[in-house]
Each structure stands twice: as structure tokens, then as C-alpha cells.
Amino acid sequence: MAIKAEEISALLRSQIENYESEMSVTDVGTVLQIGDGIALIHGLNDCMAGELVEFSNGVLGLAQNLEESNVGVVILGPYTEITEGDEVRRTGRIMEVPVGEELIGRVVNPLGQPIDGQGPINTTKTRPVEQKATGVMARKSVDEPLQTGIKAIDALVPIGRGQRELIIGDRQTGKTTIGIDTILNQKGLDTICIYVAIGQKDSTVRANVEKLRQAGALDYTIVVSASASEPSPLLYIAPYSGVTMGEEFMFNGKHVLIVYDDLTKQAAAYRELSLLLRRPPGREAYPGDVFYLHSRLLERAAKLNDDLGGGSITALPIIETQAGDISAYVPTNVISITDGQIFLQSDLFFSGVRPAINAGQSVSRVGGSAQIKAMKKVAGTLRLDLASYRELESFAQFGSDLDEFTARKLERGKRTVEVLKQDQNKPLPVENQVLIIYALTKGYLDDIPVEDITRFEDELNSWTKSNGSDLLNEIRETGGLPSDDKFEATINEFKKSFSKSE
């Protein structure tokens, strides 16, 4: 068979014409220095701030410091296998986490990877971790209540959907308990909850997850955990990952509650990173942008206007103080960013007043407009009564001969303190709260011994399930306060069957 030269040349020509050379240019650098979760990279000249870079062992890092010839990178994972001279590549991507309904009921790390041993999360949707907060015109003022189920909060420092309410206090004063109880109270209220555990012991996180699971709250909750054993970059990222997951639901018209437990540890992790990156330290050795660290996080909590679906993110950041000092750097920063604070006091906690809320220093700047009418009416004078009781109590210690008015006020004050006490993990529906606070403020508890108040309330709640359900239903469905006659009939009917202790 003869081979023609023309055929060969035509074949070669067509091959050459169809040849496509795909050149891929990758920006590659080398590790100059590595340690404590920080790497100094040389050669990534076009790297962007906040860009993800990939080390040769597959671990990702986040570009933070862009210097003249080097890039400071925080490593998002184990860094012990990375050595000097290793290759580092740009990815051209910014950090994103998986979002969506598939995350509900799962425990994930700040990168969105499951750590609960229940298999992979089947979602392809992701959102950037660093996102600009919702603009002014996209928001609307807080007008819907978010019930915590805690009498002292719903009556004295009410929280609305879209609000940022700080929970602040020393260690071991019940801060986490308030966050967990609020999550438990959202059962059946069509709210997605996100619990972000930052720098806590693994055993503590496990105990809290079990609490949520036993109460059936894990069915509407996502847990994001960056425990104390994780590298500090993950502790720094964790709150942003949590709020990113929440934004997906908010922009779809849903209501979200997010608890950051706690932001003091996030600030400490960020201080550690900044000092290792050789950024200049400021007050208490924190970097200059520690205010922005928290403001850009908490500003992402919002109530969207109706055109955007009316969704909301309500944030409950937790801050731990040292010896009750709320004038330290991070506490004052976060107090100035949030819409109010719940101040928990060690003295109250150890004297048996739990939740240990200091009514004088706790405030809600926007929640009052979201309180239901019934609660607003019955709890109107409660804060004042409590403040005057605390004042009289300190005077009464010095003298025994008190006039009748003062003695009566002291007795009412003791009962007020008892009514506002509440066991942990037992949130109370708002209609039951209105009933007991009405009974207190209208004097129905004045003839009940102080030691019987808790038992009186428990038995009243049990009794009304079968006998006073009409009254409770009216409060629940209308939000208004039923007539005094209805309250009087219900409370007096119950008091007939209540036996006081001798």
C-alpha cells in the first residue's frame, strides 16, 4: 500500500491546527518560618487579603498580613507536618462554609466539617465567611418578641427578634445556662438556633449537646464547636462561620437565634494571632482592630424588612468578666456594640438567686417595643419594686423598728425575688409568666409564706393546665391582658386548694 506524502502533510497540518496549549499559571511560594499556627510565606506576590492558600500536605491557610516580600498566613488545621521550604499555592478563593437545612441537628467545626461521627453533610451550598453586614435600608426596627422562657429576662430585659443582647458576668454565674435555656424555649416556635462554642472543653460541649438532644432541641439547632484543643485560628473563625450559616436562613425569611459562647475567648485567640503576626499591640495587648473584630460580627444580626422576607438573626453574645469588672477593654467594646446587656452577679448567684441577674445594671435598649402587651402591663413596675426593695433591704439591716409601709414593701420584695428564681433547663411559656407576675404585683402572694412561693408557682402551673387553660390560651393567642375578674377567679379558685406549710 503506497503512502502519499500529501496525505501525511495534510494529517500533520490538521493536527497542528487543532493543537491547543492550555497553560496554567499558579502562584507558588515557599514557607520561610512556621510555628504556633502561623506561617511566613515568601513568593506569593499577588496574594489577596483573606485569600485561602494551600500547603503541600493539603492543609489550608488564611492570608492575613501582606508585607512587601512576605505573606503572614494563619493555618486552619494541624501545622506540625508543615516544614520550612514547603511549597504553598494560591487558591484564588476566599473562605467559605457549607450552609443549608442539612446542617440542622449536626455538630460541626468552624470549617463546616462534621465532628459528631454521623457521616458527611450532603449540601453543596456555601457562603463566604466574611460578609458585609445588611445595610440600613434593608432593615426594619425590632417589633417581634423573642421569648427566652426565663421570667427575669422576659419581664425585666425583654429581647426582640433581630436584637443583640449581651450576657455578661464572671465565670460560673450561669451565662451558658441562659443561652441553652433560650434555645430550649424555641421549641415549636419556628426558630433555627445556632450554638457557637468557642474555646470550651470538649466535655462541656458534649454535655451541652446532650442537654439539647434530650430536650429535642437538636432538631432545630446547629452546634459549631471550636474547642480549647483547636488551633487559635479556628477559635477566631468560629463565630463568623456560625453567623454565615444563620444568614442563609435569615435571607430565606426564617428567624434565627445565635449564641456565641464566648467572645472573650475569641478576642484572646485573635490577640494571640496578632502578636504572632507581629502586629503592634494596644490596650491590654489587644490589636488596634479588636473593636472591629466584634462589631463586624454583631452587626450581621438584623431584622430584615418585609420586602426581603422579614427574616431575622438574634444574637446573644457572652462575655466573661474578671471579678465583675465590666469596664475592661473587651466588655466595654461589646456593651457599646450591643442593644443591651444582662449582667450576672456572683454575689447573687452564691446567695441562691438564680438566674443571678442584676436588675439595676441589666438593660434592653430595643426589646421593650417587642414585649407582648400582657407582659408590658403586669411587669411595668417590677424593676422599680426590685430596686426599691434592694435599697430598703440594706437599710433594714441596721434597724428593727420599721413602719408598716416599709415592712410591707420588704415582704413584697422578698416574694418578688422568689418569683424571679427559676431552675435551669426549665423555661416557662410566656402566658404562665404573665399569670404568676400578675399574682405577685396585685398582692395575691402577700399571704403566702416566702418559703412556699416556688411550690405555689409550680402547683399553679400544673393546676391551670386542666382548670385555667382558657385564661392562658387568651394570653397566648391575643398577647393582650385578660380582665382582672378572670385572673381573680382563676387565682382565688386555686388558692382554695393550696395548702400552706406550717
Curated annotation (Swiss-Prot):
A single Gene Ontology molecular function, please? proton-transporting ATP synthase activity, rotational mechanism
All disulfide bonds of the chain are none
Where in the cell?
Cell membrane
Keyword line: ATP synthesis, ATP-binding, Cell membrane, CF(1), Hydrogen ion transport, Ion transport, Membrane, Nucleotide-binding, Translocase, Transport
Kindly list the positions annotated as binding ATP.
Answer: G169, D170, R171, Q172, T173, G174, K175, T176
Under Enzyme Commission nomenclature, its number is: 7.1.2.2
Gene Ontology CC annotation, any one: proton-transporting ATP synthase complex
Query: How does the record classify its membrane topology?
Result: Peripheral membrane protein
Task: Give the catalysed reaction(s), semicolon-separated.
Answer: ATP + H2O + 4 H(+)(in) = ADP + phosphate + 5 H(+)(out)
- Per the UniProt record, the site (Required for activity) maps to S362
Q: Which domain of life is it from?
A: Bacteria
Q: Where is this region: Disordered?
A: 115-134
Q: Which Pfam families match?
A: ATP-synt_ab, ATP-synt_ab_C, ATP-synt_ab_N
The family assignment reads: Belongs to the ATPase alpha/beta chains family.
Quaternary context: F-type ATPases have 2 components, CF(1) - the catalytic core - and CF(0) - the membrane proton channel. CF(1) has five subunits: alpha(3), beta(3), gamma(1), delta(1), epsilon(1). CF(0) has three main subunits: a(1), b(2) and c(9-12). The alpha and beta chains form an alternating ring which encloses part of the gamma chain. CF(1) is attached to CF(0) by a central stalk formed by the gamma and epsilon chains, while a peripheral stalk is formed by the delta and b chains.
Name the job this protein performs: Produces ATP from ADP in the presence of a proton gradient across the membrane. The alpha chain is a regulatory subunit.
**Protein name, UniProt field:** ATP synthase subunit alpha
Gene name, per UniProt, is atpA
